[in-house]
């Protein structure tokens, strides 16, 4: 899948001058149904972690300056929540796990989402400053697809786009 941004004017809190774009990318492959040490499934743990962002201890102004997009991937990558200010995130995601692990596609789509958001910030009628994008990738395993395209795409992105994004991998 190729990330296709909404054609609507991006939702941002107008009172914030500098924004922090954050992509949350969640592995929803079948292996995420495995039980963790505490008896919950891995997907339940990630669901709780991501949903808890709605209750994060930040001021409304700080929450308004963080824009999030939530992606999920198994056999393919899909948008669960298109870009919204963190202050508008309800934390009511319900995740199901099945399929393979299209990790390479998830990385490419996460990069594309950050590029799309940066273009929206830089639109003539917006002119919003942005911090370096953050991508948080929650996964438990190894990709079931060839990673060479994702590696090449990532290297090109890091060399061409300034500022690029930081990618954090959270192993479950």
Task: Please place each PLM-identified region on the residue numbering.
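…and closely analogous acidic/polar surface helices at protein-protein or active-site interfaces
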Residues: 19, 30-65, 161
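Extended, compositionally biased accessory segments flanking or bridging domains
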Residues: 22-25, 42, 46-52, 80-89
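Acidic, polar low-complexity linker/tail segments
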Residues: 1-40, 118, 122-125
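VWA/integrin I-like adhesion module and closely mimicked acidic/polar interface patches used
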Residues: 141-172
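Short beta-strand-loop
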Residues: 64-94
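Surface-exposed acidic, glycine-flexible loop patches that form ligand/cofactor-binding
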Residues: 12-16, 55-62, 113-129, 159-161
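DG-centered beta-turn motif at the end of beta-strands
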Residues: 26-29, 46, 70, 110, ...
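Von Willebrand factor
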Residues: 78, 90-131, 145, 168-172
């Amino acid at each position: 899948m190729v990330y296709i941004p909404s054609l609507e004017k991006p939702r941002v809190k107008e009172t914030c001058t500098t924004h922090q774009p954050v992509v949350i990318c969640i592995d929803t492959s079948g292996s995420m149904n495995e039980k963790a040490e505490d008896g919950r499934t891995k997907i339940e743990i990630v669901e709780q972690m991501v949903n808890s962002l709605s209750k994060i201890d930040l001021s409304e102004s700080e929450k308004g300056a963080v824009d999030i997009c939530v992606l999920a991937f198994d056999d393919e990558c899909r948008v669960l929540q298109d870009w919204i200010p963190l202050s508008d995130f309800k934390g009511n995601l319900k995740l199901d796990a099945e399929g393979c692990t299209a990790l390479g596609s998830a990385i490419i789509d996460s990069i594309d989402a950050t590029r799309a958001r940066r273009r929206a910030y830089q639109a003539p009628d917006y002119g919003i400053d942005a911090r370096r994008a953050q991508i948080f990738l929650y996964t438990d395993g190894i990709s079931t697809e060839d990673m060479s395209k994702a590696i090449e795409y990532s290297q090109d992105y890091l060399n061409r786009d300034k500022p690029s994004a930081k990618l954090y991998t959270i192993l479950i």
